[in-house]
Amino acid sequence: MSFRGGNRGGRGGFRGGFRGGRTGSARSFQQGPPDTVLEMGAFLHPCEGDIVCRSINTKIPYFNAPIYLENKTQVGKVDEILGPLNEVFFTIKCGDGVQATSFKEGDKFYIAADKLLPIERFLPKPKVVGPPKPKNKKKRSGAPGGRGGASMGRGGSRGGFRGGRGGSSFRGGRGGSSFRGGSRGGSFRGGSRGGSRGGFRGGRR
């Protein structure tokens, strides 16, 4: 009881990974015992009518894969797979007439070779980094650069244009407001009020 319950957490992750292999066993369904069998597990103890085994094979069994004795007599089928990848356990659902308590510790169970999956299938695959693409990078880096240059050119021209306006040379040419710009800048306004402005008004009269 404790073994089965204690490993249910691990079983969840394991089961999710191995369900892909479950469909594979259905594709290769065969009648009768296989021609050859390989060692799959060693008996540990019975649990709720099932057999709990420690895997002695480097590969992982399919769910529902038939399990045999060495003489190819079928004992049952793989029911659950437990534990981490480096220490795999599994349970056997006994067939009709087979008692889990009739086995002793160390008894071996067997499986057909086509009911096994390589353990590498369940290991995380490293990310493959592709070769750099210098052509694409050059195009990408060149486009923003050109844009930046154009933007700077626009910014520069605006700055210069505004500077001219602020300096009153252009504005003055347009509507005489250069004198205002200059007057705001300092001495010219005072002078214009004191002299030029008065003289000009006098001239108009």
From Swiss-Prot:
Belongs to the GAR1 family. This is H/ACA ribonucleoprotein complex subunit GAR1. It is found in: Nucleus, Nucleolus. Residues 4-21 are annotated as: RGG-box 1. Pfam families: Gar1 (PF04410). Keywords: Isopeptide bond, Methylation, Nucleus, Repeat, Ribonucleoprotein, Ribosome biogenesis, RNA-binding, rRNA processing, Ubl conjugation. Its main location: nucleus. Non-catalytic component of the H/ACA small nucleolar ribonucleoprotein (H/ACA snoRNP), which catalyzes pseudouridylation of rRNA and is required for ribosome biogenesis. This involves the isomerization of uridine such that the ribose is subsequently attached to C5, instead of the normal N1. Pseudouridine ('psi') residues may serve to stabilize the conformation of rRNAs. The H/ACA snoRNP complex also mediates pseudouridylation of other types of RNAs. The H/ACA snoRNP complex mediates pseudouridylation at position 93 in U2 snRNA. Essential for growth. There is a cross-link at K77 (Glycyl lysine isopeptide (Lys-Gly) (interchain with G-Cter in ubiquitin)). One of its GO terms (biological process) is snoRNA guided rRNA pseudouridine synthesis. Residues 147-205 are annotated as: RGG-box 2. One of its GO terms (molecular function) is box H/ACA snoRNA binding. The gene is GAR1. Present with 5730 molecules/cell in log phase SD medium. Residues 1-23, 143-205 have a biased composition (Gly residues). It comes from the Eukaryota. It comes from Saccharomyces cerevisiae (strain ATCC 204508 / S288c) (Baker's yeast). The modification Omega-N-methylarginine is found at R8, R15, R147, R154, R158, R165, R180, R184, R189. PANTHER family: H_ACA RIBONUCLEOPROTEIN COMPLEX SUBUNIT 1 (PTHR23237:SF6), NUCLEOLAR PROTEIN FAMILY A MEMBER 1 SNORNP PROTEIN GAR1 (PTHR23237). The keyword RNA-binding applies. The modification Asymmetric dimethylarginine is found at residues 4, 8, 11, 15, 19, 147, 154, 158, 162, 165, 171, 174, 189, 193, 197, 201. Component of the small nucleolar ribonucleoprotein particles containing H/ACA-type snoRNAs (H/ACA snoRNPs). The protein component of the H/ACA snoRNP contains CBF5, GAR1, NHP2 and NOP10. The complex contains a stable core composed of CBF5 and NOP10, to which GAR1 and NHP2 subsequently bind. Interacts with snoRNAs. Residues 1-31, 124-205 are annotated as: Disordered.
